[in-house]
Amino acid sequence: MLRSIWGAALVAAGVFWAADVRAATPAAASASYALPAAAADDAARLDAAMPALARQLLADARDDGRDLNQRFRLQLVAGDYAAAERSLEALSASATQGPVPVRPNLAQYRLYARAKRLQTQQGLDFDQALSRAFAELVTTMDDRSAGVAMRVLNFEAADLPRQQRALAAALAPLRTQAALDRDAALALVRSYQVERSYAAMAPRLPALTAADDARRYAIQRDVAVATPDGATVCATIVRQRNAPQRQPTLLNFTIYADPVTTLNEARRSASNGYVGVTGTSRGKACSPDRPVPYEHDGDDAAALIDWIAAQPWSDGRVGMYGGSYEGFTQWAAAKRRPKALKALMPSVTGAPGLDVPMEGGIFYGFQYYWPLYSAGNRGLDTAAMEDGARWDRMYRQWYLSGRPYRELPQIDGTPNPFYLRWLSHPDYDAYWQAMIPYRDEFAALDLPVLTTTGYYDGAQIGALYYLREHYLYRPQAEHYLVIGPYSHISGQRGTGATGDSLRGYQLDPQAQIDIGELRYQWFDYVFKGAPKPALLADRINYQVMGANVWKHAPSLAAMAQRRQRFYFGAQAGGDGRYAFLARAAASDDYAEQVVDLRDRSDAERIVPGGGIVDPELDTALSAVFVSEPFARAQEFSGLFSGQLEVGTNKRDFDFNISLYELMPDRRYFELSRYQSRASYVDDVSRRRLLEPGRRTVLNFEAGRATSKRMQAGSRLVAVVSVLRNPQQQINYGSGKPVAAESVADAGEPMRVRWYGGSYLEIPLSD
C-alpha cells in the first residue's frame, strides 16, 4: 500500500543517484531502439551492442548538443573519448546563477575519459593510462580543487554493487520487449556508463589517491580518544603538510563510520586551511564499545573537542558542521558547552524525540531499520538498509495482521532493541530532553550558527526547532537560516548532489547553490575575519519558488506581510470536496470523516501523485478543502498554523494536513504539511487524551516552512487526512499506549468531525 517506505528511506539516506538524464522531447521519445535480448544476461554481448546504441541516440538528439550531461555519457559509451573530454570540460567549467554557484564535480568521468583516450590513442594498458591521466588531471590541481575532486574519486564500498543493481534494472525490459523507447534507452546508457566507469577504475584508484594524499597531507587514521567515562571514540585527522603550526579545527562527528566518507570530509576541511577531523560515535570504527545511537554523542563529541583543543596543532578553536545525524551531534555537543566549541553549521538536522524517530508523537516506519544499518556493527550494514523487499514485506505483514506495533521485531525475525527503547518513550520526556539543548539551555549558547534545510527536507522540523528555540531563549543569537526547495540531500550538500530538478519541480536558477562551498565561506567569516557570506543578508534567507529570487527577513514571522484565515466549510460539493470559507460556518456545522481502522482492503493500493508538481493527489481517508481562485498572485512564505475544532468518538486519532497550490493548469504544487497525534498537539511532553463525543480545540503551528509565488487564478487546497497506513504506527483511539494497541482495539469505525470554527492561517504577501 502507498509508496514504498523503502523508497522514502532511500531518499532520506541519500542512496539514490542524482537524476542526470532529462526527459526526451515528444518527437524523440517516439523513436525505438533495439538491442539483442541476450544482452540482458551476457556482458560480452552487452559491451558489443552498447556503442552502436549510444551512436544512434547521439544521431537522434534533439537538443542541438546543449545537454552536455547527457551528451558526454553517450560519447563515452560510443567510444568517442576525445569528444567526451570536450563535453566534460565545457560542463565542468559551467556554473549556476545562484548566490553560491554550483560547479559540476565530474572528476571521475574526466579521469576515465582521459584514460580511455590515452589507452586508445597510445596503445597503453588501462592501468598505465589511468596513472598517466591521474598525473595530468589530479596531481596538477591545487589542494582545494583536489579536495573537491577526491569526493568522487574515493569510491565507497557500496557504490559498485549499487550501480550493478541499477544496470540490471535498466536491462530488465530487454527480456520482454524487442526495443526500448528513447527514455529507457538513455537510462540504460547512463546506468551502463556509470557502472563500467566505476568498475574499471575501482581496483586502481585507491593507490593513486593514497599517493596524492600522502604528498599533500599528514593523515592520522583510527586515533583512539578516551572519554571521561572510560569509553573510546575514534578520529581521523588531516592536516596540510605546509600548514601553519596551529590552526582552527573543523569537526564532523558522525555515527556513519564509512572510512571513505570520513576521510573525504576531513580532507576537504584541510584543503580549505583548517585541521580536518572526523569523529565517530562510540562503538564505531576503532572504538571497541557497543554502538548506541543518540544517547552518548553529546558527551563524546564534547570530550573529543576538549582533546582537540589540547593538541599542539590546534589554536584552541573548533567549529562543527554536517547534516542529518551530524547536525544533531553539533547541538548535542553544544548542550555540554565545551570551551573550544566556537561555531556550528548544522544542516537538515533531526531533533530526537520531536521529528525522529517520530513526528507529532507518531512513529515512522522507515526509522525502524535505521538502527540496524547504523548501529549493528562498527561500520555500516548497507545490505540491511537496502533490503527494500524485506522491509516492505515486514510492514505489509504487520498491516494485514493488525498486531501491535511493538511486535515488529517478531514479525521481521531480528531483534531491534533500540527501536523498542524509543517506542517506550512516546512522550518528549527526560530521555529525549537529555540529548539536545532544552528550553533555557539555549540561552547560554552564544556561538554563531548557520542552519541549512529545505522545504522538502524530512528533518526541516528539527532544523527549525533549534532555530526557534535559540531565538526564543537568546533573542540576540547570531543564528542564520538558509532554506529553499531542497531535500534531505540537497539541503546539506547543495543542488550539485541532486540536479536542477526535485520530484518533478524544475528549480529556479537562483535556487541552485553549493552548500559545501557556503560552509567554508561561513567558517572563514567566523575564524579568519573574511566577509560574511553574501547570502546571509538577514537572519532568515529563503528562496521564493516560482519567483527566482532570494529574500531575507529578520524572523520567520516577518517572511509574510499578513496572515489570512481559511475556514473549513461543512457542505461537500458535487465532487465531494469542501469549500474554504472567508468566514466561519455555523458553529454546529461540520465535515465528517468515517474511517474503519480494521479495514485492510487498501493493502495493495497504488498511491497516486507523489511529485512536488503533480496532476493527481492522494485523497484517501481525507477531507479536501478548496479555496476560491486568487484574484492576483500571492506569495505564501513562512509557517502556517491553525485552530481545529474537532469531535470524535475515540480517545485519540492521528491526522495530517497537506497544503497544495492548485494551479490554473489543474496541476498541484506541494507547499507544506503538518502531522500530529491529536493527544500531543498541545504538548509533546505529555499525552492528553480526548473525551469521546466532546468538542475539542487543537491549536497548532506547523514546523515546516515554505515560500512559493502562487499564480493569479490558483487555489489553495488542504487535504486533511485521518491516518491509517503501513508506513507508520496506527492509532486505534482506545487511549492505550499506541505501540501496544492492536486491531482488536479498533472497535466501531472512527468518526472525526471538523466543525465550522476550524481554520488554517496562511502567511501571505502580495
Model-derived features: positions:
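Accessory cap/linker subdomain of secreted extracellular hydrolases
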Residues: 146-197, 203, 208-211, 271, ...
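Short beta-strand/loop motif that positions the catalytic acidic residue
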Residues: 445, 451-453
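A catalytic-pocket lid/entrance helix-loop region that shapes and gates access to the active site
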Residues: 321, 328-392, 455, 474-520
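N-terminal cap/lid segment of alpha/beta-hydrolase-fold proteins
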Residues: 203-245, 630-632
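Alpha/beta-hydrolase fold nucleophile elbow
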Residues: 312-325
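Conserved alpha/beta-hydrolase "acid-adjacent" motif
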Residues: 458-464
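C-terminal, loop-rich substrate-recognition/catalytic regions characterized by aromatic stacking residues
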Residues: 399-403, 496-766
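Cap/lid segment of the alpha/beta-hydrolase catalytic domain
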Residues: 240-309, 494-506, 651, 657, ...
